[in-house]
């Protein structure tokens, strides 16, 4: 009986899943998203990886899928090796896999996407990511100075997933000089990559000969001024029909057509970043906010019943915000994750230029996975909701029940 279908794209996040299926001969069909017609209807998020199992089981998020696949391994000793033999080992394996999935991968991804021109380049953000990468590498080095593997005495799912995350960086933005500074991490990485379990998917990983870096776009050469036309030529040009006139340039973003606002969004973003939120920043915001220029929306995730671990839900928010990068100059807001593992949700408040949410949000492919409700700050309950979403210091009220905020992201 088939054990399911795994929908993937080409990403190091999927190396461990592919390895488990191949090495342990699991009866799981691997489908490339580009070759699938049914994927979008099965998984509304349209994000890979995704797994369809027996009896309608649906899983998203790489870690959840890998833990499920590892549990399908028939050999009990192999299962214990991959997942841990007791609660301490299991917790350590989840700890290292989670650290790699959330922190290592995300901090590598932002510089990579910036250098490739896929998201706007921000030097401050990129530098902060490299500092975090070095700090994470130091944590791995400290463990691997005395141990062969990250979580237990044997290669585990923690190693498989973490090595996949580091592979992304080592093949792109982490060049020879960086690798030379981290011999323990590199010894571990090479050991895991050579393991029979992951040898096949890791065979395509080529360490970067030179680190990928940011290349500023080339400035276009200014056109030479044309020679002054004679009076006769000018008259001839004036006589041309209006159809020959050059068409007006369209705005790069629909919201650009609204022009500049009296409310300076960048001033608010700096205020929010630099001052205490509730006592200082929020009073400043309400004093300067112009509801004729901006509107505020309650944004809620439609598929909370599909969410599992809270850090995965937060990663989902981070990905959504990354895909909104084309609109961030017209937006500000927060989405928070409330609740606990296997019982959590995503909600928040986002301010956008204009009175319609769609032009700001529809730049993200998954924008329809969220529902949008316009808020009226003249109503005390709506204003307080915005305050709470942006301050993160009070529980979220869901169906009359208080739910603690466990994580969140700021869109700015």
UniProtKB/Swiss-Prot annotation:
Q: Where in the cell is it found?
A: Cytoplasm
N-acetylserine occurs at which residues? 2
For this record, the Gene Ontology CC terms, alphabetical, are: cytoplasm; cytoplasmic stress granule; eukaryotic translation elongation factor 1 complex; mitochondrion; nucleus; ribosome
Superkingdom of this protein's organism = Eukaryota
Domain EF-1-gamma C-terminal, chain residue ranges per copy:
251-412
Q: Which Pfam families match?
A: EF1G (PF00647), GST_C (PF00043), GST_N (PF02798)
Ranges of biased composition (kind: Basic and acidic residues): 220-247
InterPro entries associated with the record? EF-GSTs (IPR050802), EF1B_G_C (IPR001662), EF1B_G_C_sf (IPR036433), Glutathione-S-Trfase_C-like (IPR010987), Glutathione-S-Trfase_C_sf (IPR036282), Glutathione_S-Trfase_N (IPR004045), GST_C (IPR004046), Thioredoxin-like_sf (IPR036249)
Residue limits of the GST C-terminal domain? 86-217
Q: In which pathway does it act?
A: Protein biosynthesis; polypeptide chain elongation
Keywords assigned by UniProt, alphabetized: Acetylation, Cytoplasm, Elongation factor, Protein biosynthesis
Query: Main site of residence?
Result: cytoplasm
**One GO molecular-function annotation for this sequence?**
translation elongation factor activity
Region entry Disordered: which residue ranges?
A: 216-253
Q: Which GO terms describe its biological process?
A: translational elongation
Residue ranges constituting the GST N-terminal domain according to the UniProt record: 2-77
Covalent S-S links between cysteines = none
Relay the record's extra comment. Answer: Present with 102130 molecules/cell in log phase SD medium.
Q: How does it assemble?
A: The eukaryotic elongation factor 1 complex (eEF1) is probably a heterohexamer. Two trimeric complexes, each composed of eEF1A (TEF1 or TEF2), eEF1Balpha (EFB1) and eEF1Bgamma (CAM1 or TEF4), are probably dimerized via the eF1Bgamma subunits. The eEF1B subcomplex with the GEF activity is formed of eEF1Balpha and eEF1Bgamma. TEF4 interacts with EFB1.
Tell me the function of this protein. Answer: Subunit of the eukaryotic elongation factor 1 complex (eEF1). Probably plays a role in anchoring the complex to other cellular components.
Q: What is this protein called?
A: Elongation factor 1-gamma 2
Q: What is the lineage of its organism?
A: Eukaryota, Fungi, Dikarya, Ascomycota, Saccharomycotina
| Gene name linked to the record | TEF4
């Amino acid at each position: 009986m088939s054990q399911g279908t795994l929908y993937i794209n080409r990403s190091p996040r999927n190396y461990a899943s592919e390895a488990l299926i191949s090495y342990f001969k699991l009866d799981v069909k691997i489908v490339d998203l580009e070759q699938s017609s049914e994927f979008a209807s099965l998984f509304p998020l349209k994000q890979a990886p995704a797994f369809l199992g027996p009896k309608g089981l649906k899983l998203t998020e790489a870690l959840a899928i890998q833990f499920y696949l590892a549990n399908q391994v028939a050999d009990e000793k192999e299962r214990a090796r991959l997942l841990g033999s007791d609660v301490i080992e299991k917790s350590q394996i989840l700890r290292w896999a989670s650290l790699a999935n959330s922190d290592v991968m995300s901090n590598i991804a932002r510089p990579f996407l910036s250098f490739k021109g896929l998201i706007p380049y921000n030097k401050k953000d990129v530098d902060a990511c490299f500092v975090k990468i070095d700090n994470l590498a130091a944590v791995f080095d400290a463990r691997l100075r005395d141990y062969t593997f990250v979580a237990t005495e044997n290669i585990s799912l923690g190693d498989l997933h973490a090595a996949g995350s580091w592979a992304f960086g080592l093949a792109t933005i982490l060049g020879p000089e960086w690798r030379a500074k981290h011999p323990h991490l590199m010894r571990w990485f090479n050991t895991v990559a050579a393991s029979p379990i992951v040898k096949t998917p890791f065979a395509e990983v080529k360490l970067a000969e030179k680190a990928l870096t940011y290349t500023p776009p080339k400035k276009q050469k200014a056109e030479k001024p044309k020679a002054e036309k004679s009076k006769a030529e000018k008259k001839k040009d004036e006589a041309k029909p209006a159809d020959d006139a050059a068409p007006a340039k369209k705005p790069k973003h629909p919201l650009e057509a609204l022009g500049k606002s009296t409310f300076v969004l960048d001033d608010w973003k700096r205020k929010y970043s630099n001052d205490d939120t509730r006592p200082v920043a929020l009073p400043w915001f309400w004093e300067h906010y112009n509801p004729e220029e901006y509107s505020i929306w309650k944004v809620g995730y439609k598929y909370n019943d599909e969410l599992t671990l809270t850090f995965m839900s937060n990663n989902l928010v981070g990905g959504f915000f990354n895909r909104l990068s084309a609109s961030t100059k017209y937006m500000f807001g927060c989405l928070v994750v409330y609740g606990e593992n296997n019982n959590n949700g995503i909600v928040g408040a986002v301010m956008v230029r204009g009175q319609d949410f769609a032009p700001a949000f529809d730049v993200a492919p998954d924008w329809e996975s969220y529902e949008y409700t316009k808020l009226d700050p003249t109503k005390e309950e709506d204003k307080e909701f915005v305050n709470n979403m942006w301050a993160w210091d009070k529980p979220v009220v869901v169906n009359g029940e208080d739910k603690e905020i466990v994580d969140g992201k700021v869109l700015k």
